[in-house]
Amino acid sequence: MKPKIFIDGEHGTTGLQIRTRMAGRTDLELLSIPEAERRNAAMREDLLNSADIAILCLPDDASREAVAMVAGNNRVRIIDTSTAHRVAPDWAYGFAEMDKAQPRKIRDARHVANPGCYPTGAIALIRPLRQAGILPDGYPVTVNAVSGYTGGGKQMIAQIEDDKSPDHIRAPHFLYGLTLKHKHVPEMKMHGLLERAPVFSPSVGKFAQGMIVQVPLYVDDLAAGATIESIHRALVDHYAGQSIVEVVPLEESAKLARIDATELAGKDTMKLFVFGTDGGAHVNMVALLDNLGKGASGAAVQNMDLMLSA
């Protein structure tokens, strides 16, 4: 029998993207709820309990509610795309390239927390340096990022695309999270293996999909002997053999004059770059991805496929 997949929240931005990625797949049976019934709790509960894998594309509280609906059904497995369970110790973190053992953990898990878009880029850069001993305990990590506006969901999409809206956002680029309490910080700290929470400054650009995440470093404050080459080598070694995460060669990065945040829009891959000053005193690590691709829906489908391979 074909595995049954239910996307709870399929009419939202992430849910629609997941549904698009599954279109044409004959190996799955997709369960669906009419948009008019999406708030029908009884119908949702029935579909959740009928699924082999339920993918939750809901706000945090609604995701917790959905998990409770299948609490007594050990057959149903869950992928949650909200922030509700990303630092929960009994949930597998759905960044398959994070560690060599992570694909197996995802494959065998009943509950998988899909990573956030910003943390996907930040953790991809930070964790290999922590594991290689290059980034010391207590280093004051800073993460700067810009995302396509689709990351804000239907509300922000309308605010930017509808110039007749009273809430129309005219600015081509804006900062938010100004209190430095963004909901993605805890997972950056936990899965980035950091002792101190990073200072995270997110922003949104007037483009639909795409993302740049930057982690700047003072080389003199890293482990003794650290260089741009050793930082790059740590990333290369960590992602060796991975098809989704590409570490761009140093010589190729050195030829670049700019990076376009939309380069990977519509793709489920990620590129990592390492840039540095001529004297080697400063390094800037950069992750490039689609906020709706590897940063959300693409990762959810990747995790689903890993779970189905069990």
UniProtKB/Swiss-Prot annotation:
Pfam families: Semialdhyde_dh (PF01118), Semialdhyde_dhC_1 (PF22698)
Biological processes per GO annotation: L-arginine biosynthetic process
Active-site residues annotated for this sequence: C117
Keyword Oxidoreductase annotated: yes
Main location: cytoplasm
InterPro entries for the chain: AGPR_AS (IPR023013), AGPR_type-2 (IPR010136), NAD(P)-bd_dom_sf (IPR036291), NAGSA_dehydrogenase (IPR050085), Semialdehyde_DH_NAD-bd (IPR000534)
Domain of life: Bacteria
Ranges in a coiled coil: none
Compartmental location: Cytoplasm
GO cellular component entries: cytoplasm
CDD domains: AGPR_2_C, AGPR_2_N
Pathway(s) per entry: Amino-acid biosynthesis; L-arginine biosynthesis; N(2)-acetyl-L-ornithine from L-glutamate: step 3/4
The EC number(s) this enzyme carries: 1.2.1.38
A molecular-function term among this protein's GO annotations: N-acetyl-gamma-glutamyl-phosphate reductase activity
Catalytic activity: N-acetyl-L-glutamate 5-semialdehyde + phosphate + NADP(+) = N-acetyl-L-glutamyl 5-phosphate + NADPH + H(+)
Assigned keywords, A-Z: Amino-acid biosynthesis, Arginine biosynthesis, Cytoplasm, NADP, Oxidoreductase
Keyword Amino-acid biosynthesis: yes
Family label: Belongs to the NAGSA dehydrogenase family. Type 2 subfamily.
Described purpose of this protein according to its UniProt entry: Catalyzes the NADPH-dependent reduction of N-acetyl-5-glutamyl phosphate to yield N-acetyl-L-glutamate 5-semialdehyde.
HAMAP family: ArgC_type2
Protein name in the entry: N-acetyl-gamma-glutamyl-phosphate reductase
Source organism of this protein record: Sinorhizobium medicae (strain WSM419)
